[in-house]
Design a protein with these regions (language model features):
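Conserved beta-strand elements of the Class I
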Residues: 5, 51-55, 108
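Short, solvent-exposed amphipathic alpha-helical segments in soluble enzyme
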Residues: 68-72, 123-126
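Short, solvent-exposed loop/turn segments at secondary-structure junctions
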Residues: 11-12, 19-20, 57-61, 81-82, ...
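Phosphate-bearing ligand-interacting subdomains
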Residues: 81-139
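Catalytic core of nucleotide-sugar-dependent glycosyltransferases
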Residues: 9-18, 23-48
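Flexible, charged surface loops at secondary-structure boundaries
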Residues: 45-49, 69, 99-104
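Short glycine-/acidic-enriched loop or helix-start segments at secondary-structure transitions
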Residues: 16, 63-66, 118-121
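Glycine-rich adenosine-cofactor-binding loop
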Residues: 48-68, 76
Length: 139
């Protein structure tokens, strides 16, 4: 039979460190990660679609709004009354209730608040939207 044993020293030290490449190399920048996500969204969920919507006009959402290039969302959804009715980077801000139905659009969600995913799912699911079919979280 085989026997398990304990090695004398760690074989791999997997900790957050300022020396990690992902912490110091510009190739790992948030902008580059968003560019990668945009590319794969274009190859998957957004492929063949003439329009989509973005949920989120906060700090995370604005970063996405600045960087959409070939495709831009038709609108951006937010729940802040000071933002709704305005334009951010040329894109109109709407209330969630103004979204087209689940079979009419796709929604990319760019909200970084810790409780946002569950709150947004709680709004989307009862209205017939299904994650990955009708919407996807980006952040």
């Amino acid at each position: 039979g085989k026997q398990f044993g304990k090695v004398a020293e760690p074989l791999l030290d997997w900790t957050e460190s300022p020396k990690r490449l992902s912490m110091r190399d510009p190739r790992y920048s948030p902008e580059n990660f968003r560019a990668l996500k945009r590319y794969y969204l274009g190859q998957s969920h957004l492929r063949g679609r003439s329009a989509f919507h973005q949920w989120g006009a906060g700090e995370v959402g604005k970063a996405w709004l600045r960087e959409w290039d070939v495709m831009k969302p038709s609108s951006v959804v937010d729940i802040n009354p000071r933002k709704v009715g305005r334009r951010i980077h040329g894109i109109p801000v709407i209330w969630p209730d103004a979204l087209p139905g689940p079979d009419e659009t796709f929604i990319v969600i760019a909200v970084g608040a810790p409780t946002a995913r569950e709150e947004i799912r709680a709004w989307m699911n009862p209205r017939g939207y299904r994650e990955l079919r009708d919407f996807v979280f980006l952040a």
